[in-house]
Amino acid sequence: AAGREVWDLGLCPTPAVAWLTRHQQAAGGLMISASHNPPADNGIKVFAKDGYKLPLHQQKDLEQRLKRSVPLGCRAGGSSRQRHDLLKVYEQGLLLQLEPGQGRRLRVILDLCWGAATSCAVSLFEQFGAAVTILHGQPDGHRINVGCGSTALDLLQQAVVDQGAELGIAFDGDADRCLAVDHRGQPVNGDHILYLWGGVLDRRGGLPDRCLVITQMANLGFRRAWMERGGVLEETPVGDQHVYAAMERTGAALGGEQSGHVLWSQHHSIGDGLMTALQLTQLTAKSGRSLAALVGESFYSYPQKLTNVRITDPQAREAWRCNSRLRDGIAAAEAAMGRDGRVLIRASGTEPLLRVMVEAREASMVEDWSRRLATLAADELGRPGPQPS
């Protein structure tokens, strides 16, 4: 314990660590998790005493200290004890943000991804009143995020249709994000969740300046629909830290990512997949309509494709903008698509991948330019070539 008193929460969601760090007045919080990545890619998420993730420069400094085995000057003594009971405190914090019993009558399938959501998702949804069916419901560190959860919706989509459920929810490994599936088996991503939840808050005056914080990945259809209803959008780079920083700067109450990270300042300082899932279930139940109908009336989602190109050289991956042939290819794509399309290329923050996103009104144009740009990136920056996202 290095001179500190350590509370071990056991298996729990990342947002539970952050929330309890703040509400239990702890000096900090640590979460060991692969997040949404493959099981071998475990890492550490570090939270300050206010529940915020450490700023990137502090994370990098800590990482360098660990690599160099810098002595930390720890004191002797300290203690460690299990506090699994605190997970119930976190659960009650979530339920206090909901209207009791609103989930009643809804049949919901939860894909718990063999991960952290197995610790409390069933309890939460049952207390909320939903009839729950579970996929991948036991913790298994060898299978977490493998062909299941928010990064692989196929099994959930089939289960929702086969079992006649109203909706399905898929979490990632540490439950800080979620995606949904409607009763027809169609996926509902973070853009639609953010639009629908934002609409609810807007109607009851809970959205200052009618502003939502989005990332570069947000769909063109979402952007145009929100602005047509008089809303304001604040764009950030990909990453929940960037989203929350913009929310702090602008006073926005809600922000999120297409991947299913949604942040609500009334509840939390990071994305919370369980809160997002419960809020989506509540707004669907209160509407008296299907999630499919709500999504269908929200906005036309432009065809969008994300292709991952494996680039093992980190310098080449980070310096892709310096490649003139790749820049010329992007310019040609943007000229061909005009204002109804765009290209976004960025290096992954967690994997040796260059992510190539193409979006346009016509799906055929998306497929064509995705293939051409991903192949060009692989040829110019390194092999092997493109992988489907």
What kind of feature is each model-predicted range?
Residues 9, 15, 60-92, 96-98, ...:
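Proline/glycine-rich low-complexity loops and linkers
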